[in-house]
UniProtKB/Swiss-Prot annotation:
Keyword terms of this UniProt record: DNA-binding, Isopeptide bond, Metal-binding, Nucleus, Repeat, Transcription, Transcription regulation, Ubl conjugation, Zinc, Zinc-finger
Natural source organism: Homo sapiens
Cellular-component GO terms for this entry: nucleus
Protein's name according to its UniProt entry: Zinc finger protein 460
Protein family per UniProt: Belongs to the krueppel C2H2-type zinc-finger protein family.
Span of zinc fingers (C2H2-type): 196-218, 224-246, 252-274, 280-302, 308-330, 336-358, 364-386, 392-414, 420-442, 448-470, 476-498
Top-level lineage group: Eukaryota
Domain KRAB: 13-99
Tissue spec: Ubiquitously expressed at low levels. Highest levels are found in pancreas and liver.
Principal location class: nucleus
One GO MF term: zinc ion binding
Purpose of the protein: May be involved in transcriptional regulation.
Cellular compartments annotated: Nucleus
Any one biological process term the GO annotation gives: regulation of DNA-templated transcription
Name of the gene this protein is made from: ZNF460
């Protein structure tokens, strides 16, 4: 078929002379962009021909055969009421078996109608395969715009769109597409119409039910109530999600560590811990984040001040919730209590972290060595041990640290600040841990107890060093002779033998001794008295055949002759 326009005293020109048509095989080789370009060009061509046709009136147009034409008195709304979809163009429903006479009329001349039919119920014109002359004929016959002809009289507005897409006559797009890929391509061509506007905020929706759901936000209505606690919700899905907190239902399971979640979004977010994915990247500094909330807060540091200030200490925050959480520090309130041991916390997140101690859960696993951690912060710090990353650098000396608090503590060396002062003797310290250890001198407290012999120590390092006596471990080995020691200090003294370093001289002799114990023993020869009076220094009493001498802070185990 070819629609032609006749101009006075001009030769007849058919639409085929200016149109470009494709076979089914050729059309299938075009991507979505190429198809869209084809439609755009054909619409422009049709528009020009229709404009030319206005001067000559429709009578000059070769009419569509009368047995295929749509009766004039039947409107589009009446077609829809009868269950006829708009993409049948001229009244022929597309979900019937085989092409209709109208479809055969639209097919390219000389082609087999059966060969042009794709995947059963899908017609050519619906997929966009209708020839340009067929579309143009529709424009001329029905006096509509190119867009209306292509998309099935969209000018009738959102009502028709709603009827078709909502399926008032049980008609759905999916029924026409046996292959999902064709549906996706089709939806990319169709304009996304959102005819339902919210009168409160102007937000548009494609379906009326979505508008009704949204409008509840403005009215404050919460029709869905939890029967367990009485809490109300504005959506049924929110109620369903909330009810899982009562019944303990956690249907979403992590395939990596087996951890369960009551929300799919929480599982997705958790899986980023295993994958290391950080999809949220700051455009300003390039820093990446695992969670959107952290990314949003970080962005505010580039663009905004901290509008929420604490009235007690003046510290600023980007969000009011963070200020409220911070203010609990000043009030001393701890509303979140552990049901296992009764310990209370001022943050819900701290309580959750604490509960992992009771459950033994360690969800954060190092991908390098397989070590697992209870807290995410500890996991991040451990990863830096593998990568060697030290992001916190001292501006004074350039020394870098992997932990921020180590940098703050180090900076006190440059400032000379010692903020931690002992109330008993007035001695000041740069670290809280130093003050705590010092106070044990006054209290006599020794919190670190050996589980083997019960001996107590005020420092963990002393306990660890002592425990090697029980285990027999000797990690410090001399590289010269292979002799091993359980402490570093005996190894250091031993190495002087190899280096011929003679650091100690006897009191009355020119002979030089290698070690402090040798010096003590040598002094006995001259004084013929106990080692204590010989060296004139405070040492523990010497037991028979064995003693433990504390010299210069080192605990030295030696067997001394008496």
């Amino acid at each position: 078929m070819a629609a032609a326009w006749m101009a006075p005293a001009q030769e007849s020109v058919t639409f085929e002379d200016v149109a470009v048509t494709f076979t089914q095989e050729e059309w299938g080789q075009l991507d979505v962009t190429q198809r869209a370009l084809y439609v755009e060009v054909m619409l422009e061509t049709c528009g020009l021909l229709v404009a030319l046709g206005d001067s000559t009136k429709p009578e000059t147009v070769e009419p569509i055969p009368s047995h295929l034409a749509l009766p004039e008195e039947v409107s589009l709304q009446e077609q829809l009421a009868q269950g006829v979809p708009r993409y049948s163009y001229l009244g022929q429903a597309m979900d019937q078996d085989g092409p209709s006479e109208m479809q055969e009329y639209f097919l390219r001349p000389g082609t087999d109608p059966q060969s042009e039919k794709l995947h059963g119920k899908m017609s050519l014109e619906h997929e966009g395969l209708a020839t340009a002359d067929g579309i143009c004929s529709m424009m001329i016959q029905n006096q509509v715009s190119p867009e209306d002809a292509l998309y099935g009289f969209d000018s009738y507005g959102p009502v028709t769109d709603s009827l078709i897409h909502e399926g008032e006559n049980s008609y759905k797009f999916e029924e026409m597409f046996n292959e999902n890929c064709f549906l996706v391509q089709h939806e990319q061509i169709l304009p996304r119409v959102k005819p339902y506007d919210c009168p409160e905020c102007g937000k548009a929706f494609g379906k009326s039910k979505h508008l009704l759901q949204h409008h509840i936000i403005h009215t404050g209505e919460k029709p869905y109530k939890c029967l367990e606690c009485g809490k109300d919700f504005n959506r049924r899905s929110h109620l369903t999600r909330h009810q899982r907190t009562h019944n303990g239902d956690k249907p979403f399971v992590c395939s990596e560590c087996g951890r369960t979640f009551n929300r799919g979004s929480h599982l997705t977010r958790h899986q980023r811990v295993h994958s290391g994915e950080k999809p949220f990247v700051c455009n300003e500094c390039g820093k990446a984040f695992t969670y959107r909330s952290n990314f949003v807060l970080h962005n505010k540091s580039h663009n905004e001040k901290k509008p929420f200030a604490c009235s007690e200490c003046g510290k600023g925050f980007y969000e009011s919730t963070a200020l409220i959480q911070h203010f609990i520090i000043h009030t001393g309130e701890r509303p979140f209590k552990c049901l296992e041991c009764g310990k209370a916390f001022n943050c819900r997140s701290h309580l959750k972290q604490h509960e992992r101690i009771h459950t033994g859960e360690k969800p954060f696993v190092c991908s390098q060595c397989g070590k697992a951690f209870t807290h995410y912060s500890t996991y991040v710090l451990h990863e830096r041990a593998h990568t060697g990353e030290k992001p916190f650098e001292c501006k004074e000396c350039g020394k870098a640290f992997s932990i921020r608090k180590d940098l703050i503590r180090h900076f006190n060396i440059h400032t000379g600040e010692k903020p931690y002062e002992c109330l008993q003797c007035g001695k000041a310290f740069t670290r809280m841990s130093g003050l705590t250890r010092h106070q044990w001198i006054h209290t006599g407290e020794k919190p670190y107890v050996c589980i083997q012999c019960g001996k107590a120590f005020c420092r963990t390092t002393n306990l660890i060093r002592h425990f090697s006596i029980h285990t027999g471990e000797k990690p410090y080995e001399c590289v010269e002779c292979g002799k091993a020691f359980n402490r570093r200090s005996p190894l250091t003294r031993h190495q002087r033998i190899h280096t011929a370093e003679k650091s100690h001289e006897p009191i009355q002799s020119g002979n030089v001794s290698c070690e402090s114990t040798d010096l003590i023993q040598h002094s006995i020869i001259h004084t013929e008295s106990s080692p204590v009076s010989a060296v004139n220094m405070e040492t523990p009493s010497i037991a028979a055949h064995s003693s433990s001498l504390d010299i210069n802070g080192f605990i030295v185990e030696e067997t001394l002759p008496l």
